[in-house]
C-alpha cells in the first residue's frame, strides 16, 4: 500500500505539472509508467484520468471569481451567455469524436512510440508558431468570436493522439486565429473544464465495479497532489509565457520525445 501511495504522489506531481503546460500530461504519464515502472496496469490507466479532476479544480479555484460572475450572468448577461456558448461549441467536437472513437484511440495509439513522435512533432509546431510574427487581435479569452471557439475545439481533437497535448493544440489554434499568448493559454484552461470533467465521469462510470476502497485512497492522494501542484504551475506558467513565449516548452517536448525514442530503441 505504501508503495502505491508513493506512486500516486509521483504521478500526481507529473499530472499537476504537465496538465496545463503544452507538453502533454497523458504522454508524460504514459512514459513515466513505461520507463520507471510506475502506473502500469488497468487501474493505473484509470488513475491517470481520475486525478485530472484535481488539476481541473485548481483552475476553478484560481478563476473562481471570474467563472462565478459568468455563471451568475448565464440568464441575463449577453457576454456571459456568449462565452458559455463558445465553450460548449469548442467542447462539442472532442465530445463527439471521443464518444465515437475513444476506445479505438486508446487501443491503437496509446503506446510510447506514438507519444514520443507526437511530442517531437508537436514541439516543432509549437516552436514554429511561437516564432511567427503574429498580430494578436483578441486579448480576452471570454470574448473570442464563436466561430473561433469552434476552430479551437476542432484543433483540440488532434490531442486525442497521446503526446500531442490538449492545451498545446488549443493554444496553437487560438494564437493562429488571433489570440495573444496569455488569452490563448487561459482559454485552454477554461476549455479543459468540460473536456476533462467529461473524461473523468466516463472513466469513473466504466471502472465503478473495479475500484476498491484502497483504490479510492490512492486516487484521493493523487487528486490532492495534482490539485496543489497545478495551482503552483498555472500561476507561474501565465507570467512566464506572457514574457518569454513557448520556446522552452517546445524544446522540452523535443528533448523528452527524443530521449524516449532512444530508450525505446535500446529495448527499454
From Swiss-Prot:
It catalyses: di-trans,octa-cis-undecaprenyl diphosphate + H2O = di-trans,octa-cis-undecaprenyl phosphate + phosphate + H(+). The chain crosses the membrane at residues 9-29, 47-67, 83-103, 107-127, 144-164, 184-204, 218-238, 246-266. GO terms for cellular component: plasma membrane. One of its GO terms (molecular function) is undecaprenyl-diphosphatase activity. InterPro entries: UppP. The keyword Iron does not apply. It is found in: Cell inner membrane. Bacitracin is thought to be involved in the inhibition of peptidoglycan synthesis by sequestering undecaprenyl diphosphate, thereby reducing the pool of lipid carrier available. This is Undecaprenyl-diphosphatase.
Amino acid at each position: 500500500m505504501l508503495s502505491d501511495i508513493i506512486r500516486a504522489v509521483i504521478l500526481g506531481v507529473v499530472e499537476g505539472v504537465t496538465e496545463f503546460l503544452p507538453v502533454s500530461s497523458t504522454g508524460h504519464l504514459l512514459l513515466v509508467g513505461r520507463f520507471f515502472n510506475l502506473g502500469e496496469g488497468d487501474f493505473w490507466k484509470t488513475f491517470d484520468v481520475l486525478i485530472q479532476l484535481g488539476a481541473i479544480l485548481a483552475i476553478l479555484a484560481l478563476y473562481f471569481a471570474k467563472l462565478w460572475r459568468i455563471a451568475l450572468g448565464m440568464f441575463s448577461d449577453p457576454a456571459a451567455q456568449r462565452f458559455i456558448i463558445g465553450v460548449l461549441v469548442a467542447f462539442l467536437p472532442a465530445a463527439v469524436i471521443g464518444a465515437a472513437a475513444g476506445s479505438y484511440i486508446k487501443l491503437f495509439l496509446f503506446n510510447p512510440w506514438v507519444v514520443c513522435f507526437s511530442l517531437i512533432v508537436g514541439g516543432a509546431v509549437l516552436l514554429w508558431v511561437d516564432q511567427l510574427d503574429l498580430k494578436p487581435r483578441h486579448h480576452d479569452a471570454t470574448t473570442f468570436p464563436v466561430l473561433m471557439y469552434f476552430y479551437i475545439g476542432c484543433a483540440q481533437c488532434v490531442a486525442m493522439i497521446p503526446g500531442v497535448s490538449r492545451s498545446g493544440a488549443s493554444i496553437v489554434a487560438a494564437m493562429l486565429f488571433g489570440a495573444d499568448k496569455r488569452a490563448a493559454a487561459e482559454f485552454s484552461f477554461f476549455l479543459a473544464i468540460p473536456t476533462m470533467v467529461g473524461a473523468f465521469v466516463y472513466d469513473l462510470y466504466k471502472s465503478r465495479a473495479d475500484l476498491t476502497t484502497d483504490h479510492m485512497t490512492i486516487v484521493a492522494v493523487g487528486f490532492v497532489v495534482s490539485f496543489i501542484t497545478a495551482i503552483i504551475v498555472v500561476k507561474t506558467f501565465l507570467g512566464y509565457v506572457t514574457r518569454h513565449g513557448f520556446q522552452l516548452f517546445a524544446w522540452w517536448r523535443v528533448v523528452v520525445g527524443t530521449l524516449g525514442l532512444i530508450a525505446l530503441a535500446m529495448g527499454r
